[in-house]
Amino acid sequence: MKSGLKIGVLAVQGAFIEHKRMLESLGCECVELRQKSDICDIDALVLPGGESTVQGKLLRGLDMFDALKEKIANGLPVLATCAGLILLASHISNDDNVYFGTLPVTVKRNAYGRQLGSFEATARFDNSFDFTMTFIRAPYVEAIDD
């Protein structure tokens, strides 16, 4: 069953394929956003995890940055994970960069340690199935801005 939504998944770097696969399994039409022309008629946006500095540079280099920022500022629904949160934040406490700046929060990059400290673990919930969890360096929200 199709949802009728066309969701753009930023696909210039990072963990975009997992988001795309899950959304497609739910019946959503997904578009990998790789160039400015891909942005035109999306109904929602996913900004995946990855490296926010690289994503920001690629968005500018591919001339996608301003078009995405305008759509977000005009109310485009966004799901942002990890690097996506950093791209949206209005302030980054441990970085001089600000990207879209459309979400009024202050975030801290790599707040949970270094990449080398990332790991996977398995847990069992309600004695029903094993669930693999991935723990990574990630940002956290330090403050909600005015």
Task: Give residue ranges: language-model regions.
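N-terminal beta1-alpha1 cap of cysteine-dependent amidohydrolase-like domains
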Residues: M1-N74
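Structural signal for conserved beta-strand scaffold positions within catalytic alpha/beta enzyme cores
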Residues: V9, E32, A80, G101-P104, ...
